[in-house]
Curated annotation (Swiss-Prot):
It is found in: Cytoplasm. This is Glyceraldehyde-3-phosphate dehydrogenase 2. Keywords: Cytoplasm, Glycolysis, NAD, NADP, Oxidoreductase. GO terms for biological process: glycolytic process; lysine biosynthetic process via diaminopimelate. Pathway: Carbohydrate degradation; glycolysis; pyruvate from D-glyceraldehyde 3-phosphate: step 1/5. It comes from the Archaea. Homotetramer.
Length: 335
């Protein structure tokens, strides 16, 4: 069977990871990535053997920089079966007309609104609904992390309501322009934050409210999750449910911080120190008067990467069973 031809529009924090993950699959291949300028990320892509595409006006700049582009972004789009749009939040919507004109399928990231694609995706919760779709939005890192735990718990025990407090990393490790550096910022001030409503685009029946703040760290987000459940269960019951999820990792054995989780990612030789799984502290899982509480950490740079691969597989109908796609993706990337 011919491999699906994938192009990544925007080779940044998410795009470069999606490119590597898709290239690792046996049913898809990267036919090109796009960069607007010949910076260090473009140089690395060139060294890795990816064909680089650029805005037509910038092709000469790439040539002069010693990394000649294979063509324009429009030409890249024409060659692909699926475009994974990893451009900065709010930019991707301006590319929709280009994709529609070329007749290609497209995946956007969580920085875009649900309405742009009309379908928000999480592999565990709603894979089958994306089969054959032309446009899909993979929800954000935080929403992905919430869907991965809320969906199986709700399926096992039923959910009356969910309340989440998110301590969000201020920015990514390579970003020198954002902060805060020495402050805690309620973000947004007006509640709820967008994360709860965003979960409902994937799991509509969930009653969920969220509040978020930005804190001066770049490593990971941390969620405090509170769920009021419909059916009685114990903390051990919840541990068994979460422990059965291939994209949930229990972190114990003296791990008490996001810094130590990132050290684990280094020690197990993950590419770019990525932690694709939700990292749940099993000792934090507590039941009190029918309500569940636990902490989880989310690696914002990588958690959505396997989800993008599964979205490609669903849209191209390479696999009809979401559970099988998840296992296939996991095996190929080493999760």
């Amino acid at each position: 069977m011919a491999k699906a031809k994938i192009a990544v529009n925007g080779y940044g924090t998410i795009g470069k990871r999606v490119a590597d993950a898709a290239q690792a699959q046996d049913d898809m291949e990267i036919i090109g990535i796009s960069k607007t300028k010949p910076n260090y990320e473009a140089a690395v892509a060139h060294q890795l053997g990816y064909d680089i595409y650029a805005p037509a006006a910038n092709l000469e700049a790439f040539e002069k920089a010693g990394m000649p582009a294979a063509g324009s972004i429009e030409e890249m789009v024409e060659k692909a079966d699926v475009i994974v749009d990893c451009t900065p939040g709010g930019i991707g919507k301006s590319n929709k007309a280009l994709y529609e004109k070329a007749g290609v399928k497209a995946i956007w990231q969580g920085g875009e609104d649900h309405e742009l694609a009309g379908y928000s995706f999480n592999a565990v919760a709603n894979y089958e609904g994306a089969l054959g779709l032309d446009f899909v939005r993979v929800v954000s890192c935080n929403t992905t992390g919430l869907c991965r735990v809320i969906y199986p718990i709700d399926k096992a025990f039923g959910t009356k309501k969910v309340r989440v407090t998110l301590a969000r990393r201020a920015t990514d490790p390579n970003d020198i322009k954002k902060g805060p550096i020495n402050a805690i910022v309620p973000d947004p001030i007006k509640l709820p934050s967008h994360h709860g409503p965003d979960v409902k685009t994937v799991i509509p029946h969930i009653d969920i409210t969220s509040a978020a703040m930005k804190i001066p760290t770049t490593l990971m987000h941390v969620h405090t999750v509170n769920m009021e459940l419909k059916n009685e269960c114990t903390a051990e019951d919840v541990r068994q449910v979460l422990g059965s999820q291939s994209r949930v990792r229990f972190v114990g054995q003296g791990i008490t911080s996001t810094a130590e989780i990132m050290e684990v990612a280094r020690d197990i030789k993950r590419p770019r120190n990525d932690m694709w799984e939700n990292c749940v502290w099993p000792d934090s899982i507590t039941m009190h008067e029918g309500e569940l509480y636990f902490f989880q950490a989310i690696h914002q740079e990588s958690i959505v990467v396997p989800e993008n691969v599964d979205a490609i597989r669903a849209m191209m109908e390479l696999e009809s069973d979401g559970a099988k796609s998840i296992l296939k993706t996991n095996k190929a990337i080493g999760l």
